[in-house]
Amino acid sequence: MKHLTKLLAAVLLALGLNQAVWADDVSDFRETLQLAEQGDAKAQNNLGAMYATGRGVRQNYAEAVKWYRQAAEQGLAAAQYNLGARYFTGRGVHQDFHLSKEWFGKACDGGVQEGCILYRYLNQKDY
């Protein structure tokens, strides 16, 4: 079980990183931040990814979660998946498989196939 969990965590991270468009440098970070602060869900998701990886800004998992959550609450399926991945791995939040399943379910409803797969996996594990 531990091996499977580690494997799924690695897959989640790899897949989650593909859910956002990367900024090239600090100026792109600033532009993305400005859009995110104005409520642009895609920019919020991208900003979360930038914080998660340290691209254009110092890596900060808690900030990544903050921005993923804002985009996810607006209904952006990619952000819902990314937030589910954070709860699955416990990076930036306390690990919570129930919340992970909830966000993966929303991502699945929004058309993110990886969210469907992980929702079913967590459902089979009775979360």
Where do the protein language model's features map onto the residues?
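Bacterial N-terminal signal peptides that target proteins for export
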Residues: 1-9
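Bacterial N-terminal signal peptides
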Residues: 9-18
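Alpha-helical tetratricopeptide repeat
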Residues: 26-29, 33, 41, 45-49, ...
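Short coil/turn and helix-start
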Residues: 37, 51-59, 73, 91-95, ...
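Hydrophobic face of amphipathic alpha-helices that form TPR/SEL1-like repeat modules
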Residues: 46-53, 82-89, 118-125
